[in-house]
Structures are given as structure tokens and as C-alpha cells.
């Protein structure tokens, strides 16, 4: 997971929703499908084949990729299971677990008349956004990201 995986918090803004949607997200990718086969067996989800079209500087085609996305219902269990083995993404996993715990503790009712959920409170939006930004900083790549990550 440290090299080929993703642990993050996604945000989606829809025009017809009164507040943004946040969700915990975990997954893994590899050029070998066999490496990923254990994940759907224990956590659900599917492995997707990505036909790679890019080439390197010598004109060689990049290897095709396989991606597995952890279902929302299994993300907490998955992160708890892999946490002892993580080296580089420990802080991200802990922040996402905190996000899941807070999200599950937040009592959210139904919207009247239009269906869907009631809007998030400003305090809840700020809490979720704070965690999302912390995870994004830790996941940043490049020379400016070193201060925010573990490795």
C-alpha cells in the first residue's frame, strides 16, 4: 500500500446539494493483477483493467495497470487491518480513520420534501475539510511535499 496504494478523503460538490460530500477512499494499483486479487476476496470491490496508452521517451508502451478500490463499507476495516504494516502512509490512514469515526458519529437527518440528507453544519464541513487538507498535504508529491509527509 505504501508504494502502490492510495489513502485519502475525497470531496464532491454538486449543484443540487446544499453542502459538499466527503468520503474516505482507499485503493491499490499494480501492473500485476495477481498482486491485487486478495483485496476483493476479503474486502469486496472489483479490480479494473486500465489500458495504458502512454509511452516512455524511447517510445515503449507503458504496462497496463490494474486498480482496486475499497468499497466505502469496508474502508475502515481495511485501514485497521493494514495499519500495522504501513511505513509511509500511517498518518494518512490515521487521519482517514478519524474522518470515518467523526462521520459515523455525526447525526444527519433527511431533507424535507426533496429527498437526500440534511445539509452538513458549518462546523462539520470545517472538520471534514481540515482532515481532507491534512491528508492531501501528506500525499503531495515533489520537493515541496517532503515537509508534510512521513518519507
Which residue stretches match the model-derived regions?
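Internal intein/HINT superfamily modules and their associated LAGLIDADG
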Residues: 1-151
